[in-house]
């Protein structure tokens, strides 16, 4: 039985978000053994329990108050929200923040040999999908009537198998669609992973732990999106060098031993430093340019 004094977090047991969710928790300093097949794993250093479940169960667990937090794709969350509203429920939860992984898009796809002149081409057609409510909302807004074919997997084979005229499914590269004679024709929803919290009163100790976790998540994401940059640069061209690094804080400037015209620059940049940028820095006279990853970061 779950201990209600411990913070309960639901994550995907296996699948698209599983590895990234586990990595995020680990980088937040939560020591936990997630390599076993147990449904519930207890953190060693914090009062936190991790529930490993199917991704489409996570929104319901949060909305029903079974767990305190959940890491879930916005596509799954929105589908469950629409499903419950269609049944007359009023689901409650809070989205604490979007995360920096799990990006995908939900798209319409049709056979490659069929003409496409917009959603109206699907009027009266049968569409296979695992997201019937998101599909209905989109096509209702377009004034398109259709028949839904609900499939929980292998949606892309439906047209070839004669089950549907088109599909609505998650797309990453489009290779699976191409292999099944389909082409992506319209994106209806873009999604990333997000962290959600249940509605209702929360014990002060739990809320303090959630606040601490949010601060650490922010630090992890900032660290992943930032780089620590060091270089030697001509003193008279510092502003030109800084202008090439948008998003960077004002740099730390240090004198170089035996050098009057050059200084050492240290800075954190929130921008990806491409080879082209490094070549421009070098053209301005910068040298010994180092770009380093940041493990942890807190403003």
Swiss-Prot record:
A GO term for molecular function: ATP phosphoribosyltransferase activity
Database matches in PROSITE patterns: ATP_P_PHORIBOSYLTR
Record Pfam families: HisG, HisG_C
Co-factor requirement: Mg(2+)
GO biological process terms held by the UniProt record: L-histidine biosynthetic process
Domain of life assignment: Bacteria
First-listed, main subcellular location of the protein, grouped into a coarse class: cytoplasm
Record-linked InterPro entries: ATP-PRT_HisG_long, ATP_PRibTrfase_cat, ATP_PRibTrfase_CS, ATP_PRibTrfase_HisG, HisG_C, N-reg_PII-like_a/b, N-reg_PII/ATP_PRibTrfase_C
EC numbers, comma separated: 2.4.2.17
Reaction(s) catalysed by this chain's protein: 1-(5-phospho-beta-D-ribosyl)-ATP + diphosphate = 5-phospho-alpha-D-ribose 1-diphosphate + ATP
Localisation per UniProt entry: Cytoplasm
Regulation of its activity: Feedback inhibited by histidine.
Keyword annotations from UniProtKB, A to Z: Amino-acid biosynthesis, ATP-binding, Cytoplasm, Glycosyltransferase, Histidine biosynthesis, Magnesium, Metal-binding, Nucleotide-binding, Transferase
Record-linked Gene3D superfamilies: 3.30.70.120, Periplasmic binding protein-like II
Pathway assigned in UniProt: Amino-acid biosynthesis; L-histidine biosynthesis; L-histidine from 5-phospho-alpha-D-ribose 1-diphosphate: step 1/9
Gene Ontology CC annotations of this record: cytoplasm
SUPFAM superfamilies: GlnB-like, Periplasmic binding protein-like II
Function according to Swiss-Prot or TrEMBL: Catalyzes the condensation of ATP and 5-phosphoribose 1-diphosphate to form N'-(5'-phosphoribosyl)-ATP (PR-ATP). Has a crucial role in the pathway because the rate of histidine biosynthesis seems to be controlled primarily by regulation of HisG enzymatic activity.
Family listed: Belongs to the ATP phosphoribosyltransferase family. Long subfamily.
Subunit annotation: Equilibrium between an active dimeric form, an inactive hexameric form and higher aggregates. Interconversion between the various forms is largely reversible and is influenced by the natural substrates and inhibitors of the enzyme.
NCBIfam families: hisG, HisG_C-term
Name of the featured protein: ATP phosphoribosyltransferase
Organism whose genome encodes this protein: Salmonella newport (strain SL254)
Taxonomic classification: Bacteria, Pseudomonadati, Pseudomonadota, Gammaproteobacteria, Enterobacterales
């Amino acid at each position: 039985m779950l201990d209600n004094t411990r913070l309960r977090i639901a994550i995907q047991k296996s699948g698209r978000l599983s590895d990234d969710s586990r990595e995020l928790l680990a980088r937040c300093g939560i020591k936990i053994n997630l390599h076993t097949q147990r449904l519930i794993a207890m953190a060693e250093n914090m009062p936190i329990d991790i529930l490993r479940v199917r991704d489409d169960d996570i929104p319901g667990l949060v909305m029903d108050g079974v767990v305190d937090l959940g890491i879930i794709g916005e596509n799954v969350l929105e589908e469950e929200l629409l499903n419950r509203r269609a049944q007359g429920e009023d689901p409650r939860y809070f989205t604490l923040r979007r995360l920096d992984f799990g990006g995908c898009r939900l798209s319409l796809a049709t056979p490659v040999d069929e003409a496409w002149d917009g959603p109206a081409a699907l009027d009266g057609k049968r569409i296979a999908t695992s997201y019937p409510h998101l599909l209905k909302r989109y096509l209702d807004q377009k004034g398109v009537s259709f028949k839904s074919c609900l499939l929980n997997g292998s949606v892309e084979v439906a047209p070839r198998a004669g089950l549907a005229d088109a599909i609505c499914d998650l797309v990453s590269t489009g290779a699976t669609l191409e292999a099944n004679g389909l082409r992506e024709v319209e994106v209806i929803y873009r999604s990333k992973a997000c962290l959600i919290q249940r509605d209702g009163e929360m014990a002060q100790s739990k809320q303090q732990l959630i606040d601490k976790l949010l601060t650490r998540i922010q630090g992890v994401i900032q660290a992943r999106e930032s780089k620590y940059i060091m270089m030697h640069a001509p003193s008279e061209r510092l502003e030109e060098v800084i202008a090439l690094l948008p998003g960077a804080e004002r740099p730390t400037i240090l004198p170089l031993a035996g050098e009057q015209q050059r200084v050492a620059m240290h800075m954190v940049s929130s921008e990806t430093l491409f080879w082209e940028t490094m070549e421009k820095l070098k053209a301005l006279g910068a040298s010994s340019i180092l770009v380093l990853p940041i493990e942890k970061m807190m403003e």
